[in-house]
Amino acid sequence: MSSAEITIIKRDGKRKGFSVEKIKNAIRKAFLSVGAFATEEDLVNILSHVRITEGMHVEEIQNQVEIGLMAEQYFAVAKSFMLYRQRHSEDREVRDHLDFLIQYCQAENAATGSKYDANANIEKKNLATLIGELPKKNFIRLNRRILTDRLKKMYGKELSDKYIRLLKNHHIYKNDETSLANYCASITMYPWLLEGTKPIGGNSIGPTNLKSFCGGFINLVFMVSSMLSGACATPEFLMYMNHFIGKEYGKDYWKNPDFQADNSIKKRTIDKIITDCFEQIVYSINQPTGARNFQAVFWNISYYDKHYFESIFGEFRFPDGSAPDWDGLSWLQKRFMKWFNAERLKTPLTFPVETMALLTENNEVKDKEWGDFTAEMYSEGHSFFTYMSDNADSLASCCRLRNEIQDNGFSYTLGAGGVSTGSKSVLTINLNRCIQYAVKNGRDYMTYLAEVIDLVHKVQLAYDENLKSLQAQGMLPLFDAGFINIGRQYLTVGINGLVEAAEFLGIEINDNPQYVEFVQNTLGLIEEYNKKYRTKTTLFNCEMIPAENVGVKHAKWDREDGYAVPRDCYNSYFYIVEDKSLNIIDKMRLHGRKYIEHLTGGSALHLNLEEHLSKAQYAQLLRVAAQEGCNYFTFNIPNTICNKCGHISKHYLRECPECHSTDIDYLTRIIGYMKRVSNFSMARQEEAARRFYHRDR
């Protein structure tokens, strides 16, 4: 192949025909810059050290020119050539930043403008959000250097280079490379009760009354979230709040909530005092914060039926020796849900993301009271997740590690798994590209997947070592203070493109033996490696990641490289989100025990409905979920927000019911959390428009 026929890859990723004259001119300029002249013989000798191959990057060619200059002992010329490259590299970086600044300012919204990790959890783009975006490219470089240095020490340069190659070829994706922080955590707040925020860099003591609990809790969530790149879950939140209400108004306060307990001019009842506390906490935490690039913290809470409560908190004692009171907590959980549901008619509140934990027995919700209340809240238009299990200790055992030889562990990286657990790092496998790559190259795709999965585990172990190194140097106070137990944190193997990979293989995406076999074999292989690399202090899980950002990226990158891509955003479910042929029960079955058996890190089913169902219908769907083993789900009905008068309706409408304006927006779940559709990136807005919503007929 002649040099004229070879194509090389430029810095912007585009291919261009190779020109030897451009290389010669660059060398001539380098000679002239030091007062010398390059003869044709000089050029031939220098270029004899350069080997050009198809698809080579321009940077590699320039590296070889440097080597050629040094080999021929033109040291001054080589130095000049290197400095020239460095200056131009700096100029390009500044130019890239300027181009990004202009594009970001002109973008439809912050999510569309973000180049690296678009998310809808930003209401409006502004200077603060721009400042947060600009350094992300450098954070990616730094994170890759830190990780590859560790990989070289642990496994050698070959594996380190392979990791970068798989990253750049989009076979794998490192989530949250733009942050140095570990991913998410479901914290225990017990250290806060004992020592306040002092152990993590604050200056406050622990809460002593209801007011200090509310203010201190807000500060705690902000502080913890600033040290995480993902979600912060506080599963003890309402239990602690119930404790402080009881200390102030008596353990049985909930029996007489209308009692006037405020002697101020407001004359507030106990109920009003409590809902004022709700308001203070929820509205404060929903505000954007500078430590999170001017977005709200991603805050999650849990509700429990009596059986889950007794399993997780049965032996819990507050510092004063008292046990948590279930009766008061049960009332407070219901009161918070009712209040939060009503409050969302006033303003589109995103957080907390709520998860209801229910125990099942004989394919029924065991706690009838809480099963009925769950159905009631869904029927009243409230939007929350439900986690169901036929073993109350299964959630407590694996997430709190009471039983360290447990084969399987459940922990969802949105932070809904339990107390003092979470995910340290997420590394995602693009199943669609990996499988198509193997098939196109005549390889058994399961064998190739095994290679990728093995590498992913080694990379995660390298990340874990770096995290331990940071902790040893005092950089992770959340671990040192006991808010998070590093031994209970998971290294998460994410998956994306599973449905698209199955489609490529000619498998129908519905409940059929071929699809079951494909899912079980693929996810079972990951679980096999999770168990292989697991130790008493190092845990792995597998999650079908929400993929708000990377689902769009994978589809774009794979299509550009000639792979079969059936849609513009890869699914985060076991079914095709726009498929109209599947009913609600079909989707629950596709997220049931046959499919999620090996998915220990979560796969939240979002059941998109056009309208709310009745309490009886939701109760029946809870039974169906229990029968099918569909353990994690929510119902998603878009709420209508009028841009003209501000009215919010829990219904999916085409015009405002108050002023009849058609200038409306919708509040729906982009992935795990609810935001205005107008806050979604443009790609995700297009995906949202393709979703199929079931109608109650």
Question: Where are the regions that the model predicts?
Answer:
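Contiguous, well-ordered alpha-helical segments that form the cores/surfaces of helical PPI scaffolds
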Residues: 239, 491-504, 524, 669
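Charged, amphipathic alpha-helical regulatory modules used
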Residues: 1-110, 485, 689-693
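Long, charge-rich boundary regions
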Residues: 658-697
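Conserved catalytic cores of very large enzyme subunits
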Residues: 98-487, 508, 512-666
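Long, highly charged low-complexity segments enriched in Glu/Asp and Lys/Arg with interspersed Ser/Thr
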Residues: 77, 81-84, 630-638, 682-697
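Short, hydrophobic beta-strand segments
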Residues: 6, 48-52, 314, 500-507, ...
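Metallocofactor- and cofactor-centric catalytic cores in central/energy metabolism, strongly enriched
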Residues: 272-275, 504, 689-692
